[in-house]
Amino acid sequence: MSAMTPREIVHELDQHIIGQAKAKKAVAIALRNRWRRMQLSDDLRNEVTPKNILMIGPTGVGKTEIARRLAKLANAPFIKVEATKFTEIGYVGKEVETIIRDLVDVAIKMTREQQTKKFKHRAEEAAEERILDALLPPAKDQYGESQRDDSSSTRQTFRKKLREGQLDDKEIEIDLAQAQPNVEIMAPPGMEDMTNQLQSMFQNMGGDKRTKRKLKIKEAFKLLSEEEAAKLVNPEELKEQAIFAVEQNGIVFIDEIDKICKRGDSSGPDVSREGVQRDLLPLIEGCTVSTKHGMVKTDHMLFIASGAFQMAKPSDMIPELQGRLPIRVELEALTADDFKRILTEPHASLTEQQRELLKTEQVTIEFSDDAIERIAKAAWQVNEKTENIGARRLHTVMEKLMEEISYDASEQAGTSLVVDAAYVEKHLGALVEDEDLSRYIL
C-alpha cells in the first residue's frame, strides 16, 4: 500500500496529466484515506468505509489516464473494467462478480512477485548449487547418495567464474519441472465454482513431471532461480495475503458507467443497463463474493466510476447507485492552451516521443514554439467543428503532420529538421479549414 501524501500523489499525476486539479485532488485524498484507515485500531477500522468517487467529464480529458497512473502509484490490487462488458445475471455475458475474481487474480500475481523478490537471494543460491552440480557432478557414497563437497577448490573456482559471468555461454543439461498445461473450460454464468474445480483437477492430473533441457548457463540460472523461488513460496500464505490486500486496499475503476444509464426518454427492459446497475449495488455496498481462492468481502474496497455523460445524466443512474458514489468530480473540457501544454509538459510528451523515435534513424527534429501553438490550435479547432474527442485529437493531428517526415526518415540519416508554423500550415492548414476533410481525415 502506497504511503504517499495527497500532495505527492497530485505531483506525480501532474507529470502525466495536464489540468484536472479537482479530480487529481479527489483521487489523492481517497488513496491517502486508504493508508490512514490501515493505521486505525481493528474495531474502528471496520467502521470506516471508503467514499466512492464518480468522475464526470467529456471524452479525452484524462479520466482513464488518471486511473492508469493511479494503478501504478497505489501499490495495491487495482483493476479497470468497462461497465459495457457486463450483463444482468441470468443473461449471456460477463457477470459483475467476475470483477472481484479478476481483482483477486491480480492480487495473487502481485503478492507472488513480492514473495519471489523476498526469497530472491535464497533462490539464487540454490540455483547456483544446482548449476555447479551439473558442471561438477558430486561423487556418490556406498548407498548411492550424492556427496557434495562445497569446500573443494575446483568447486570454488567454478563458483567464482559463474558469479563473474565467465560461464554464461557454456551449455549444460538441467532437470526442470514441466510446465502444467493451462486448461480453459467454458461454463454458463453462475457455474464458476465447478469450472475452477475441473480446471484444478485437470492440472493436478499431470503430477510433478520433470524434463531434461540443454540450455546456456545464463538462461538456466534464470529458470532455476524461478523454480527455487516458487518452492519457497507458501501457497496458503500467498492466498491469505492476497485476499487481505484485496479486501483492505483493493481499488476498482469502472469506466463508461454512463453507457449503462437508462435515458429518460427510453422505455422497456434493457439487459445491459439497469440490470447491471442493480448487480453493481451489492458489490459497491459490500457483499461476499466466492472466488477460486476463497471468499472475498467487498465492504472496504474503493470504487471509482467514470463516464462522459453526453447522452445521459448522472441523475439517470438508479438512485441507490447514485447514493453509493457520494464524491462527484467534474473534469473540464480541454482548451487550446491545455493542448499546448499537453504537447510539451508531461513526461514522455507527444513531441518528445516523436523526437526519440526519429533519433533511432539518426534524424534530429525540433518543434518551434509557434509550431506547437499552431498544432494545439488545429486540434482544438477540429474538436470544435466536429466531435470533441479531447486530447486524443492531438494523436491524430500529430500523426498526420509527421507522416511525410516518418516515411522519409530512414533515407535522411544525419540530418536535422525544424518543424515551424509554416510547415504545420502547409500540411494541416487545408485539412483544418475544410470541415468535410477534417471530419474524415482528422
Curated annotation (Swiss-Prot):
- Identify the residues that bind ATP: I18, G60, V61, G62, K63, T64, E65, D255, E320, R392
Q: Which GO terms describe its biological process?
A: protein unfolding; proteolysis involved in protein catabolic process
Where in the cell does this protein reside?
Answer: Cytoplasm
UniProt keyword annotations, A-Z: ATP-binding, Chaperone, Cytoplasm, Nucleotide-binding
Give the Basic and acidic residues compositional bias ranges: 142-152
Gene3D superfamilies documented for this protein: 1.10.8.60, DNA helicase RuvA subunit, C-terminal domain (1.10.8.10), P-loop containing nucleotide triphosphate hydrolases (3.40.50.300)
Q: Is Ubl conjugation there in the keyword field?
A: no
Question: GO molecular function: any one?
Answer: proteasome-activating activity
| One CC-aspect GO term | HslUV protease complex
Q: Where is this region: Disordered?
A: 134-162
InterPro entries noted in UniProt = AAA+_ATPase, ATP-dep_Clp_protease_ClpX, ATPase_AAA_core, Clp_ATPase_C, HslU, P-loop_NTPase
Task: List, alphabetically, the Pfam families matched.
Answer: AAA, AAA_2, ClpB_D2-small
Which family is this sequence assigned to?
Belongs to the ClpX chaperone family. HslU subfamily.
Function of the protein: ATPase subunit of a proteasome-like degradation complex; this subunit has chaperone activity. The binding of ATP and its subsequent hydrolysis by HslU are essential for unfolding of protein substrates subsequently hydrolyzed by HslV. HslU recognizes the N-terminal part of its protein substrates and unfolds these before they are guided to HslV for hydrolysis.
Assembly information from the UniProt record: A double ring-shaped homohexamer of HslV is capped on each side by a ring-shaped HslU homohexamer. The assembly of the HslU/HslV complex is dependent on binding of ATP.
Q: Kindly give the NCBIfam families that the UniProt entry links to this protein.
A: hslU, PRK05201.1
In Swiss-Prot or TrEMBL terms, this protein is called: ATP-dependent protease ATPase subunit HslU
What are the top taxonomic ranks of the organism? Bacteria, Pseudomonadati, Pseudomonadota, Gammaproteobacteria, Alteromonadales
